[in-house]
Structures are given as C-alpha cells and as structure tokens.
A protein has these predicted regions:
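Donor-nucleotide binding loops and adjacent catalytic segments primarily
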Residues: 12-98
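C-terminal "capping" alpha-helix adjacent to the active site of nucleotide-linked donor transferases
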Residues: 140-143, 149-166
Length: 208
C-alpha cells in the first residue's frame, strides 16, 4: 500500500502539548476513531458504549465530510474526554497523538495506522466489503490488533487493547512492519524503465 510521505515524518509537536491543544489528557489511553471520508454511524455507537462503560480512555473522532455526524458527536456531555474533527488532511498528526486505532478494515486507514505503529480494532462480518475481509484476517495473523464481529463488542475489545502487556505487544508487532512503498516504488520504476530502454532494438526502416 502506497502511503503519503507525511505518515513517515517525525511528529511536528510533542505529544503532551498536542493532546493539551485538543483539550485531552496525557495520562489516558487515546484512540483515534476513523471510518473513511464520510464517517459512519458506528462512531455514535462506539462513543455511547464506551461512555456508558467503566473504561478510562479518551477518543479522537475524525468524521470526514459528514458534518451532521460531527455535530452529533459534539452535542451533549460525555464522561470520556473527546475531540471531534471534521474533514482534515492532518490525519497523521492525530494518529501521532493516539495509542490505537478504531475503524473499518479498509486498506488505507489500516496501513496508515500501522505505519505509525498504532494497533487496530476493526470489525469483520457479513456486511464487510469482500476486499476488506482479508485485511481483518491479516490483522489477526500478524497480531497487530483485535477483530470484532460488530461494534457492540467494543467495550471488551478496548479493555483487551489497553491492557499494558497486550498494547505493548501489538505496538511492537505494528512497529516491526515495514511499508516503505512510497519511497521504494519510484526507484523500482526507474530500474524497469532503464531495462526497457536497453532492450528496445534500434528502429529499422521496413523495406518495400
């Protein structure tokens, strides 16, 4: 998966300061919740279930262009600290502030999270797109996160994720993955072009 170079860059601000800027705390596990460019109603369920639980964490919701969803998440009180963002090109900055990712098993979001050493919590069921189901299996096989049948299971899944030994293991496994395609592919293409140019025979006019 080719990712934007910004997902490999060093943080632009220190984590404690970044969290404080969002009104969040440095002493709580932080999840970034992202469901593509238009968000998902599942984000409301995740917010409600975790808020009603006894888990101690905080949430960064990225709702994309779904302003109605963003407004719904901003309205009303919440037991858990949260920050709600709409559309942004700074997903990498929010991921730098997080400890893990919650979302769908799309190749883009999962690859971005893992590039930043974030373990993932994703769902996989009959409604999951066929091309995304393998990603969920891959997450389990590589032990880089938790796969749910539905987000009704989010509370125990988060409990498992934030258990210190599990989080450390998942993060170590995520950090061991190397996806440098954005930097490697241009060089590979250049080599292919060079070989192609060398293999082309000089043009010879066709005799009539």
């Amino acid at each position: 998966m080719i990712l934007h170079p910004r997902f490999y860059e060093a943080p632009v601000e220190e984590r404690v300061a970044g969290l404080a800027r969002l009104g969040l705390r440095a002493d709580l596990p932080t999840a970034v919740v992202l469901f593509g460019g238009y968000g998902s109603q599942a984000m409301l369920e995740i917010a409600e279930r975790l808020d009603d639980s006894k888990r101690e964490l905080q949430l960064i919701f990225i709702c994309g262009r779904n302003e109605k969803l963003a407004s719904a998440l901003r309205v009303g009180g919440s037991r858990l600290p949260r920050f709600v963002e709409g559309f942004t090109k700074d997903v990498n900055r929010y991921m730098h502030l997080a400890d893990f990712f919650i979302g769908k098993p799309g190749p883009g979001s999962v690859s971005e999270a893992l590039a930043m050493k974030l373990p993932v919590i994703v769902s996989c069921n009959a409604w999951t797109l066929p091309q995304e189901r393998y990603n969920a299996t891959w997450v389990l096989e590589n032990e880089v996160g938790v796969v749910l049948r539905s987000f009704s299971e989010i509370v125990p899944a988060v409990g498992r994720m934030i258990e210190p030994a599990n989080l450390a293991r998942f993060r170590a496994n995520a950090g061991g993955l190397k996806n440098r395609a954005v930097f490697e592919i241009p060089g590979m293409l250049e080599q292919i072009l060079e070989k192609s140019e060398k293999s082309v025979e000089p043009y010879a006019a066709v005799k009539t």
